[in-house]
């Protein structure tokens, strides 16, 4: 799905650790939305909501404040959420610390967190499998990508 609008960005400053995040999205018209976290990691993709409907999306985030990205280091300041949607909606988020296992992944450019320009176009934006990986886990595990 392509998104023309800038994403709604929610930032919650927290120390390093693992957190359960619940994002509640309420549609004011028929919408399709995608939730990304941290460095564009997919947490929920192409969720449909009808006008007046709400959806709670719960996922886990591992916060590590120092990541190497090519030759640069990226400072992550807590839980970072982007909600991509071209329709009219409101969103709330709740962040709570949790004590759960974390899967650490590393690898080459096929794993790494790739940046994207907006408007978002899935056909012309690269994405490592490490960015898609977290959406396939339930709320009992977190994924930390150090590729």
What are these model-predicted stretches?
Residues 2-17:
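Short beta-strands within extracellular/lumenal beta-sheet-rich domains
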Residues 63-85:
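Noncatalytic modules at the cell exterior or secretory-pathway interfaces
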Residues 10, 21, 57-59:
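Hydrophobic residues positioned within well-ordered beta-strands of beta-sheet architectures
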Residues 81, 85-146:
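Serine-esterase "nucleophile elbow" of acetyl-processing enzymes
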Residues 17-23:
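A short tyrosine-centered beta-strand micro-motif
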Residues 10-11, 25-46:
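Short, surface-exposed beta-strand/strand-loop-strand elements in extracellular ectodomains
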Residues 16, 47-56, 64:
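Solvent-exposed, conformationally flexible loop/turn segments
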Residues 14-16, 27-29, 63:
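Beta-strand elements of well-folded, non-transmembrane domains
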């Amino acid at each position: 799905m392509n998104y023309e609008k800038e994403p709604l960005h929610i930032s919650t400053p927290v120390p390093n650790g693992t957190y359960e995040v619940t994002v509640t999205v309420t549609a004011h018209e028929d919408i399709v939305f995608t939730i990304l976290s941290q460095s564009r990691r997919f947490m929920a993709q192409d969720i449909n909501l009808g006008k007046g409907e709400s959806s709670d999306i719960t996922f886990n985030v591992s916060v590590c404040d120092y990541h190497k990205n090519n030759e640069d280091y990226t400072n992550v300041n807590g839980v970072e959420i982007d909600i991509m949607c071209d329709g009219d909606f409101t969103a709330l988020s709740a962040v709570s610390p949790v004590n759960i296992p974390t899967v650490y992944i590393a690898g080459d450019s096929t794993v790494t967190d790739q940046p994207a320009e907006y408007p978002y176009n899935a056909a012309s934006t690269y994405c490592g499998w490490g960015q898609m990986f977290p959406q396939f886990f339930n709320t009992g595990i977190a994924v930390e990508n150090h590729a």
